[in-house]
């Protein structure tokens, strides 16, 4: 029985990536030398959690720092970009916190009075 693949990291250059058959799978550059293939969008998992626990949009908070987080940055959800995040993600965010390695999630939670 085949297992579903959720994420693949490929160490390659941009030139080398041109020869990789992606078969329509969504991909983003994780780092300059690493291509990330993530066939399942993260928002899908959030929708499943919302359905299971009967949550509404106002109860959803997402944190992100990379282009693979873009699908979660929906206007109806509270979106928080990490300070070290990619510029396009920061543009979509409702709040930008400190870097991930500077306790950015903690800082945002304190800022909004969640803790």
What are these regions (language model features)?
Residues 1-75:
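Conserved acidic, metal-coordinating active-site core of Asp-based
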Residues 52, 75, 79-115:
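Asp-based, Mg2+/Mn2+-dependent phosphohydrolase catalytic module
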